[in-house]
Amino acid sequence: MLKLRDIRKTRGEGPQRYSLVVPRLDLRPGQRLALVGPSGSGKSTLLDLLALVLSPDPGGVFECRADDRTLDVAGLWRSGRQDVLAGLRSRVMGYVLQTGGLLGFLDVQRNIGLSRALLGLPADATVGRLAEQLEIADQLHKLPAALSVGQRQRVSIARALAHGPSIVLADEPTASLDPLNAERVMQLLVAQAEERGVCILVATHDEALARRAGLQ
C-alpha cells in the first residue's frame, strides 16, 4: 500500500535542525507494527509523512497503491496536487491522535460517523457496531466533554476505522491513559484493525505495551 525508498524530511532551524531518513519502508495489508522511541525521536514526523499531511524533501521514492493503481506521492507533492493527496488521505488513511482530536460540538455518534459522512458513505450499522466492539455503545449521545480520557480514545479509534481505511496510524494513543486503560485501549485498537485486515502502525514510547498487544 505504501512504499518508501530513501525518503528524507528536514525540519527546524539552526541547532534545532534535524533530518529524518527512511531508507526503506513497506506497509502492507494486515501488518501490525509498532514505531518505538522516546519523545523527539521523529515518530510523529514519520507518521505525518505516511499520513500524507507532510511533504518529503525532494528525492527518493514514495508510492501509494490505492484503487488498483499506484500513485507517485512524492510527485503529487512536487506538483502541488493537494486535491489528489486530500482524496487519498480521506479514503485510505485512518488517524488516531494522542489526544483524540474529537469535535466538541458533535456527540459521539456523529464524531464516529464523521469520516463516513465526509466521503458520502451511507449511514448504516457501522457506527453502532464499532461502538459495541469498543465498549462505548452507551455513550453515543454524549458530547466528548462528558467522557473519560479512555472513552474519548475509543471514540477516536472508532472514527479512524469507520470509513474502512486501508491503513490506520496512531500517534501515542495511550500516552495520556493510566496503565489499565492503556492496556485495554491498545488491545481494542489492535483487535479491531486485525479483524478488518487493516495495516496498523502505532507510534509509542512503551515497547512492552506494544509487544503485549501483538505489535511487531
Located regions from the model:
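Catalytic Walker B motif of ABC-type/P-loop ATPase nucleotide-binding domains
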Residues: 168-171
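A short, proline-enriched helix->beta-strand linker immediately N-terminal to the Walker B motif
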Residues: 162-166
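Conserved ABC ATPase "signature" region
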Residues: 124-139
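Conserved ABC ATPase signature
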Residues: 143-153
